[in-house]
């Protein structure tokens, strides 16, 4: 298996920043408990409070794929278009 690293950047509209921050924060603990999650870190950019960055390591691509189908993510996914200032930027890396 090849370990997978994801670095994702999410930028909120200023008027939806707090709502998005809340939704994103709620994903951290359930995700960390998922099978195959090595680590899952959520950060707010030091210079732009509307910019959120995720750093994730997964045991395999299959584990990441399973994560993206988890029920706890669905409330977030259904709101993204309304909350985001631009599309999510994802860097998909292998170790």
Specify the residue positions occupied by each region the protein language model found.
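Short, flexible turn/loop "capping" segments at secondary-structure junctions
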Residues: 1-4, 45-46
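Localized chelating/binding microdomains
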Residues: 25, 54, 95
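Active-site-flanking beta-strand signature of metal-NTP-handling nucleotidyl enzymes
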Residues: 5-10
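Solvent-exposed beta-strand sheet faces enriched in polar/charged residues
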Residues: 41-43, 55, 91-93
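Short, surface-exposed ligand-recognition loops at beta-strand->loop->(often short) alpha-helix junctions
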Residues: 12-17
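Short, glycine- and small/hydrophobic-rich beta-strand elements in well-ordered beta-sheets
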Residues: 29-51
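An amphipathic, aromatic/His-enriched active-site/gating alpha helix that lines ligand/cofactor pockets
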Residues: 26, 32-38, 57-90
